[in-house]
């Protein structure tokens, strides 16, 4: 399936990049993963670090970015089937995913860290302390993959990290592995203040994010990579990063 659609009044599609009308870029994203992608409850708009990145890429490359909200484990199948053109959703580059889709160069190393209750925190000094434990995870996440490799663990999966945090807070599991920036950001939010959770500082493993496209779509892949390179070179990437993570310590 073609990866771009040019909107025309008669509904006719064209691949001409030189045309006046913007090309629609259908971007799949899990929009409940602040601060990377989420829905602003005040105006209903999709916001976050990834959303700012892809919209800036769209501005530079002439795309009309259309965000399509979906589950994390639905992103790769949607790319394979051609229902979306790109996946931009704090998506970890893994060998399993790379067999089915193509990734840009990594644009962020989030790093997996441990979220647990304040009572359990002193008991966890390394990954070994998670062995033979009941753990929580977001379904389809890199954290879930890593936890399943820890000897003796049972991993309960949830539709979102927020749901997993709630279960962890209730004592439904011992701990969870999740992207470090998300753990830290969550603990700065009002919703977490009445919860008994804390994030540990040590990084369990690297967690490199990439934007994904349908296998073999070299044209779009190059445009995304080129735009990210340009944004790093001119300081735009750093400005967007500081906007979302500058106050997250």
What does each of the following model-derived ranges do?
Residues 15-21:
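Sec/Tat signal peptide C-region and signal peptidase I cleavage site
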Residues 51-60, 118-121, 128, 133-134, ...:
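Extended ligand-binding regions for polar small-molecule ligands
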Residues 22-91, 99, 234:
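Extracytoplasmic small-molecule ligand-binding "clamshell" domains
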Residues 31, 109-116, 180, 184-225, ...:
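Periplasmic-binding protein-like
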Residues 51, 67-77, 122, 156-170:
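Short helix-initiation/N-cap motifs at beta->coil->alpha
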Residues 63, 91-93, 105-155:
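A conserved helix-loop-strand patch within extracytoplasmic ligand-binding domains
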Residues 74, 89-99, 146-149, 174-205:
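A ligand-binding cleft/hinge motif common to bilobed small-molecule-binding domains
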Residues 37-40, 54-61, 127, 140-161, ...:
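Ligand-binding cleft/hinge of the Venus flytrap
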């Amino acid at each position: 399936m073609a990866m771009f659609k040019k909107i025309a009044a008669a509904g006719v599609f064209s691949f001409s990049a030189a045309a006046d009308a913007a090309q629609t870029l259908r971007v799949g994203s899990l929009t409940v993963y602040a601060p990377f992608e989420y829905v602003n409850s005040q105006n209903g708009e999709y916001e976050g670090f990834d959303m700012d990145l892809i919209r800036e890429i769209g501005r530079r490359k002439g795309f009309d970015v259309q965000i399509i909200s979906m589950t994390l484990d639905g992103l790769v199948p949607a790319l394979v089937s051609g229902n979306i053109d790109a996946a931009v959703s704090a998506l970890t580059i893994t060998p399993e995913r790379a067999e089915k889709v193509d990734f840009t160069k990594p644009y962020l190393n989030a790093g997996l860290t441990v979220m647990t209750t304040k009572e359990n925190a002193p008991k966890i000094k390394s990954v070994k302390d998670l062995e033979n434990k009941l753990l929580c995870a977001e379904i389809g996440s890199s954290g879930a993959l890593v936890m399943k490799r820890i000897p003796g663990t049972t991993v309960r999966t949830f539709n979102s990290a927020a749901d997993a945090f709630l279960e962890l807070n209730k004592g439904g599991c011992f701990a969870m592995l999740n992207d470090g920036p998300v753990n830290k950001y969550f603990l700065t939010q009002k919703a977490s203040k009445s919860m008994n959770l804390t994030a540990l500082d040590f990084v369990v493993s690297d967690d490199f994010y990439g934007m994904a496209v349908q296998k073999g779509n070299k044209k779009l892949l190059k445009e995304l990579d080129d735009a990210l390179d340009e944004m790093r070179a001119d300081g735009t990437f750093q400005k967007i990063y500081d906007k979302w993570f500058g106050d997250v310590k």
